[in-house]
């Protein structure tokens, strides 16, 4: 404990040097001091690569965010898909054919449900909207020409302390970039999975606020799904 507060070892494992998560937290807070004062920038829409490197992210030892991102790009450049899953750790857990991903708890279920379809997971552990936005712009995912793209992103922005309105704007930016890169693809946007044990927990309330914003959007041919009821008992 530090002055009565519980020490968060995920941020500074050796109590001196920040982890990738801690470095991201530092950068986010520094941004508030260094950004122009005339207009507050939205970090959720500013496309940047990720900074994760830990094997605990479900990757082979020695792999980092850039290696994992490049593997996705290479895989998608070689195949045409029926379904492309875009997202973070939840989507990464579907597995697909990626060799750098060692933890694939959802692969058997996805294989069973979509056994007659060609699909791939482009999820990366720890990714926020701004990281997926960067990958969409630089990874040339559109070469796989998926019939469907399923997007699940934003919970790590909640964890990072971003505002609900900013997160919703970041999610919308991801949808629009997907439309731009894959104009013939049908997009299914799956909203945030519920977080927090209680309805009144700050994380749950922020997720609900994001759902409320997204549900009011005019999506056109994009299908928006709120999965909260799949996991939460009334």
Feature annotation, model-predicted:
Residues 1-40, 104-118, 127-130, 134-234:
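Alpha-helical cap/lid subdomain in secreted, periplasmic
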Residues 2-16, 20-86, 90-112:
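N-terminal secretory targeting modules
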Residues 83-85, 119-121, 224:
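Conserved beta-strand scaffold positions in the cores of enzyme catalytic domains, especially
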